[in-house]
UniProtKB/Swiss-Prot annotation:
Originating organism: Paramagnetospirillum magneticum (strain ATCC 700264 / AMB-1) (Magnetospirillum magneticum)
Main enzyme class: hydrolase
Top-rank taxon: Bacteria
Keywords: Allosteric enzyme, Cytoplasm, Hydrolase, Metal-binding, Protease, Sodium, Threonine protease
Function summary: Protease subunit of a proteasome-like degradation complex believed to be a general protein degrading machinery.
Example GO molecular function: metal ion binding
This protein's GO CC annotations: HslUV protease complex; proteasome core complex
Residues reported in the UniProt entry to bind Na(+): A167, C170, T173
Organism lineage string: Bacteria, Pseudomonadati, Pseudomonadota, Alphaproteobacteria, Rhodospirillales
Protein name (Swiss-Prot/TrEMBL): ATP-dependent protease subunit HslV
GO BP term (any one): proteolysis involved in protein catabolic process
Active-site residues, as the UniProt record annotates them: T12
The family this protein is said to belong to: Belongs to the peptidase T1B family. HslV subfamily.
UniProt EC number: 3.4.25.2
Record comment: activity regulation: Allosterically activated by HslU binding.
Length: 182
């Protein structure tokens, strides 16, 4: 079987949103290889930086952990400066031959800012404070945008509802959610 005909790893829907001074990152638990579910309870959302930063990652697992380790190192070097740490990581990502081949994306957030780190080494801040990445990211993003202005729904409720909608549409997303908030 040639490398290009090998089944690819799929999975992960990560959603980050802000509402009423709260920030939430939610991730599903499914990892698939081709049409097979390999794991249903993977943890793709974490707190780092002493619990002050939320991270959700999508893409190849080993690559995502490599980037997470690099981000943690940048945060140690630039404590309390999430944007600067992400920009420094992006610089490395663009210039390091090894990192350039990593296939992963991350959504990161602290109390002030939410950012996407793309597979091309970009750092993007969404204009509406809502991020959706991974196989079901666009579904979760659309659902969160539809729910965000509804009175009585807090950030975690919106995240859970949006992720449930994504899980109902995307075959690479399940309903086993991990939610972290600040």
């Amino acid at each position: 079987m040639s490398e290009s005909s090998l089944p690819s790893w799929h999975g992960t829907t990560i959603l980050c949103l802000r509402k009423d001074g709260r920030v939430v990152i939610a991730g599903d638990g499914q990892v698939s290889l081709g049409a097979t579910v390999i794991k249903g309870n993977a943890r793709k959302v974490r707190k780092v930086g002493g619990g002050s930063i939320l991270v959700g990652f999508a893409g190849a697992t080993a690559d995502a952990f490599t980037l997470l380790e690099r981000l943690e190192a940048k945060l140690e070097k630039h404590p309390g400066q999430l944007t600067r740490a992400c920009v420094e990581l992006a610089k490395d990502w663009r210039t390091d031959r090894y990192l350039r081949r990593l296939e992963a994306m991350m959504a990161v957030a602290d109390k002030d800012v939410s950012l996407v780190l793309t597979g091309q080494g970009d750092v993007l801040e969404p204009e509406d404070g809502i991020i959706g990445i991974g196989s079901g990211g666009n579904y979760a993003l659309a659902a969160a945008r539809a729910l965000i202005d509804i009175d009585g729904l807090d950030a975690e409720t919106i995240a859970r509802k949006a992720m449930a909608i994504a899980a109902g549409i995307c075959v690479y997303t399940n309903g086993n959610m991990i939610v972290e908030s600040l």
